[in-house]
UniProtKB/Swiss-Prot annotation:
This is Activity-regulated cytoskeleton associated protein 2. The keyword Transferase does not apply. GO terms for cellular component: extracellular vesicle; membrane; virus-like capsid. Keywords: Membrane, RNA-binding, Transport. InterPro entries: Ty3_capsid.
Length: 193
């Protein structure tokens, strides 16, 4: 085995550095120190998505680099999330790694059959407005694998779960998009109230 002197090692390292592309990250303009969003470690898909979306938006607006975001992420954790982070932080080499670890642990993907069960057991309640009902149902449909159903099929699912007052006033064959269904549903609400 060959050994290098300190001087040889220094020259070796400088040579390697000079051969590689210079990749400097732009200086970060901010940190998470003023971010008010917090995550407590609840195992809830929607809560995790909401947290990640808020943090990503804050990061972008404040110009926080991935490197600084990764360092500052623990500032946004409370409760069990703090304990969890202590155990996994070495596995998070990048910002993307950290977000994926967060999703994997606190927001495991539900199997499709469970999502379908949620969709079909949730009929529109009597006093629920059309906007709210369709929004909730579409959020559930969005959890299914990409491209599973076209809009026409998704409309069929949701139409069957709507209150009769909407179905009686809006023939299914007359609406081709969710936008049309919402517009027609709002008209029903204005004329029936």
């Amino acid at each position: 085995m060959t050994q290098m002197s300190d001087e040889q090692f220094r020259i070796f390292i400088e040579t390697i550095k000079s051969l590689g592309p210079i990749k400097e990250e732009p200086p970060s303009k901010g940190s998470f120190s003023n971010c008010t969003v917090r995550f407590s470690g609840q195992r809830d898909h929607d809560a995790v998505d909401e947290f990640i979306n808020a943090v990503e938006t804050y990061k972008e607006v404040e110009g926080i680099s991935d490197k600084d975001a990764l360092k500052g992420l623990p500032l946004l954790f409370k409760s069990i999330a703090v304990v969890w982070w202590k155990g996994v932080r070495r596995d998070a080499k990048t910002w993307s790694d950290a977000l994926q670890l967060l999703r994997d642990h606190f927001s495991p993907t539900k199997p499709s059959y469970q999502i379908y069960m949620e969709i079909f057991e949730t009929k529109q309640s009597y006093d629920e407005v059309i906007d709210s009902f369709i929004c909730k149902q579409r959020a559930l449909l969005a959890k299914l694998p990409e491209g599973r159903h076209d809009e026409e099929t998704e409309l069929d699912f949701i139409y069957g779960l709507m209150q009769p007052k909407y179905r009686e006033s809006i023939p299914r064959h007359e609406v081709k998009t969710f936008r049309e269904l919402l517009d027609r549903g709002r008209t029903v609400e204005r004329t029936r109230h």
